[in-house]
Amino acid sequence: MSTQGLVTLLGNAQCHLRTSTNYNGVHTQFNAALNYKNKGTNTIDGSEAWCSSIVDTNQYIVAGCEVPRTFMCVALQGRGDHDQWVTSYKIRYSLDNVTWSEYRNGAAITGVTDRNTVVNHFFDTPIRARSIAIHPLTWNNHISLRCEFYTQPVQSSVTQVGADIYTGDNCALNTGSGKREVVVPVKFQFEFATLPKVALNFDQIDCTDATNQTRIGVQPRNITTKGFDCVFYTWNENKVYSLRADYIATALE
C-alpha cells in the first residue's frame, strides 16, 4: 500500500498536537514531526522527537483536527539523536472528542526498532475521526517518537447558481417540425477547480401545440470548469416562442 495522494497532517500543519507529558520544554510535541532534526549546534532545538516525562503506558500524543478527517495510515519513527523508540503502541480515536474508541479493540501495533526507520501502519478500514491518539505500550529505553498521520484529502462542496438563460423571443424552436434546438453558452461566475455537475430547470415556458402535448426539454452540454452549453430543444409539431431556465452547478474541491 502507498501513501501517495494522501494528506500529511503534521507535515501540512492541519492538526493540533497535545501530549500527556513532556520531558521538558524542548522535548515536546513540536519536535514530533516525521524526520524532524535539530541543528546540532546548541540545545535550543531540543530532542529529535517528542519525549514523555513519565515512562508508563498512560502516555499519549493526540492529533486533533478542526473538522472530521478520514485517517488511512499512521507512521512511526524513533528519536533521531538517542537510542529511544516505541516498539509497540495502540490507537484510540474520537469523532466528537468526547467518546473514544480503540482501534482493533486496543490490540498492540508493531512499532519501530531503531532511530530513523519509518514504519507505516495502514488501518484495516479507514478511521473517521476528529482526533486520533498514539498510546505507547512498549519502548526501548524511553518513550520517544516522531510520527505522521495520513488522511484522505478534505473535499468541500462549491456551488454556483445562475438565472435567466433565455432562448430569445420568437426563437428557432418556433418554426419547422421534428427535432430542433437552441444552444445558449453559459459562463460561470468563477472557474471551478474540478468539473461540476449542472442541473437545469425551467422558469418560463411560452409554447403551443395542436395536439395539446407539450414536448420541450433542457439539458447541459460540453460542461467545463468555466461554463457549459445550455441546450433547449423540442420535437414533433411543437411551436416554442421562448424558454427560460435557471441552473445550479456544484463541484467537490
Swiss-Prot record:
In Gene Ontology terms, what is one molecular function of this protein?
A: carbohydrate binding
Q: Name one GO biological process term.
A: cytoskeleton organization
Cell attachment site: where is this motif?
Answer: 79-81
Taken from the record, one Pfam family name reads: H_lectin
**From what organism does this protein derive?**
Dictyostelium discoideum
N-acetylserine modified-residue sites: S2
Describe tissue expression.
Stalk cells.
Q: What does this protein do?
A: Galactose- and N-acetylgalactosamine-binding lectin. May play a role in cell-substratum adhesion rather than in cell-cell adhesion. May be necessary for the maintenance of normal elongate morphology during aggregation.
Protein name in the entry: Discoidin-1 subunit D
